[in-house]
Amino acid sequence: MEFLAPVEAGDLVDCVPEPVGNGSVEVQALVDGDLRARLVAHPPGGVHDMGKDWSDRPLSERLPDHVEPLVDQWINYAERAGADLALCAKAAVVHPSVWPALANGVMTRHLVDGSWIHTSSRIAHHAAVPVGVSALVEATVVDRFDTRSGSRAVVDVRISVDGLPVVTIEHEALVSLGPSAP
């Protein structure tokens, strides 16, 4: 999902699907014909294989795995995060807002000490997940670099349930604020 411009309360949003090849479909969210957000839905299998070889990236620093039971605080997480869409609650499936929160957990457990800023995420959803199961969160740091604002890390986060991939996220953050070089 890529958010390009705000959608205001009361805006009529047109969701327009367009085939883009390889069986993928881009869904564009338009307000008065202006593109506000888009996502690309890929067919199952092969698109984001679990266990990808990261030899094309600067790093391949594997972080410890984490098992997260999708109960308690995750059941109503979307509502607390401001997404009042009742569809997921009625269907008893995990709301998509949970996945970047789990990726944030990777950052706070392993990469940051103190203040930090989440800068971007590219999220690919592979399957709906029922509430109450446990998710395996696997993460690999694939890039680190310094900017004027601080040190950044890019992490590939793979989330699976019962061995099946449900979400992959490329999660980037400023993990150390302030100039990193003298």
Q: What function would you assign to each model-found segment?
A:
Residues E2-L12, V16-D65, A128-P182:
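HotDog/MaoC-like acyl-thioester-processing domains
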Residues E2-L4, V40, P44-S120, P179-P182:
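Hot-dog-fold acyl-thioester-processing enzymes
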Residues L87-S151, D156-S160:
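Structured core of small recognition/catalytic domains
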